[in-house]
A protein has these predicted regions:
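Alpha-helical membrane-anchoring segments
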Residues: 1-218
């Protein structure tokens, strides 16, 4: 019952100022808060939301644009003065040809693969610790690079979530029919239907709710 007032307040405020809804990361914290209202399957709900966020973020990196993100994020990092040779290697022919190099393309492909695969790895018992280590690795990489427009507390939260939800606990797949219909409905809508509509009609669905953080309508 304690989680319902914040959810109700968010639902009331959001239509009047949608910035509140996006700044609150309702597509992540809001879904998780709702899952906590169900004592019998809260852990499953939190795990599914986290897997959905990772998978959506990974899929949104697919395409030719993400390699430019890797180059610019690395070059604008506070750590940039410590790795000049690496930064030059990210360009095809620094300083005359600033296009992403093969190294940059490989790094972007690895980042895309890592974030897309970390959810399934965490959900599968024998590989869950590998998934946790992978999650800690790429969230730490993003955090220490301090990229523009990136919410760093989200990376810290995801690292904590990886350890607690999949390191401390195994994937809590409930028996068939054990998930409350309300929770199942919200998870289906929030993690499948809304992102699918957002992929088909990106101008109509906010990029966070469509799980398009790297391909969104900012």
């Amino acid at each position: 019952a304690e989680v319902l007032p914040p959810l109700a307040l968010l639902a009331v405020m959001a239509p009047f100022d949608f910035v509140i809804a996006e700044c609150s990361r309702a597509e992540h914290y809001g879904y998780m808060l709702f899952a906590l209202a169900f004592s019998d399957s809260w852990l499953f709900g939190l795990q599914i939301v986290q897997i959905g966020l990772w998978t959506g973020a990974g899929v949104s990196k697919l395409g030719p644009r993400f390699k430019y993100t890797v180059v610019n994020m690395s070059c604008n990092s506070p750590l940039a003065p410590l790795m000049p040779s690496f930064l030059r290697a990210l360009h095809t022919g620094f300083p005359t040809d600033m296009r992403p190099s093969r190294l940059a393309r490989a790094a972007s492909a690895f980042g895309t693969c890592a974030e897309t695969c970390v959810g399934p790895l965490c959900a599968f018992g024998p590989t869950r610790y590998l998934g946790v280590v992978l999650a800690l690795g790429f969230h730490s990489f993003i955090f220490f690079h301090l990229p523009f427009a990136s919410v760093q507390e989200w990376n810290i939260f995801c690292m904590w979530a990886a350890v607690y939800l999949f390191g401390v606990h195994e994937f809590a797949l409930p028996p068939s029919g054990a998930v409350h219909p309300a929770l199942a409905t919200v998870l289906l809508l929030g993690l499948v239907v809304v992102p699918a509509v957002g992929q088909l009609f990106p101008a109509r669905v906010p990029f966070l709710f469509a799980f398009r953080p790297y391909a969104g309508n900012w």
